[in-house]
Design a protein with these regions (language model features):
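Short, charged, surface-exposed secondary-structure boundary motifs
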Residues: 14-15, 35-38, 75-81
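Conserved Class I S-adenosyl-L-methionine
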Residues: 72, 79-101, 107-159
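Short alpha-helical
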Residues: 10-11, 50-53, 73, 113
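Class I SAM-dependent methyltransferase SAM/SAH-binding core
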Residues: 1-33
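A short, conserved alpha-helix within the catalytic core of class I
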Residues: 47-61
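Conserved beta-strand signature within the Rossmann-like core of class I S-adenosyl-L-methionine
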Residues: 62-75
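Hydrophobic beta-strand segment of the Class I
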Residues: 41-45
Length: 159
């Protein structure tokens, strides 16, 4: 079994390498993975854009991909702090040419994030780039945040 992992964030790659040293890691984009064509039996893509052409290239015929996207309630309470009108994430049924959807599962829970980790969590979200300053200030003032988390695991097979 050979494992490889890629992320555009160098700290994430370092953390993964410490957690599972038997795998190989690289700082790389989903759109340009440093592996040969047809190398992968399974891809796991978490909260990254769907790089369809690159996934097609990297997966062997019949290979599978788990695509993790946020569920409707993911970080809803964080959005309630950041925005005057919080919103649920859209849940869409998607079809990608060259892939066949073969399953889906949603996992939900609640987490409490201490103050010293709130900024790091916030920085990993798209909200970081589009939140007004007053919303950012409200989040920074919290001693902790309890929020829902929701992940949709979409399973695809390469045709």
């Amino acid at each position: 079994l050979q494992l490889a992992g890629f992320d555009i964030a160098k700290p994430a790659v370092r953390l993964a390498a410490k957690a599972l040293p038997a795998a190989r890691y690289a700082v790389a984009s989903s759109f340009s993975q440093p592996v040969r064509t047809g190398w992968a039996d399974l891809l796991l893509n978490c909260f990254s854009p769907f790089a369809q052409e690159e996934f097609q290239r990297v997966l062997r015929p019949g290979g599978r991909m788990i695509y993790v996207v946020p569920g409707a309630e993911h970080l809803y309470q964080m959005k309630a702090v950041l925005y005057d009108t919080p919103y649920k994430n859209p849940v869409q049924e998607v079809a990608y040419p060259g892939f066949r959807a073969i399953g889906e599962r949603e996992v939900q829970g609640t987490i409490t994030v201490p103050h010293d980790q709130l900024e790091a969590l916030f920085a990993m979200t798209p909200y970081y780039w589009k939140t007004p300053r007053d919303g950012t200030a409200r989040l920074a003032a919290l001693p902790e945040l309890t929020t829902d988390i929701a992940f949709r695991f979409l399973l695809f097979e390469k045709l």
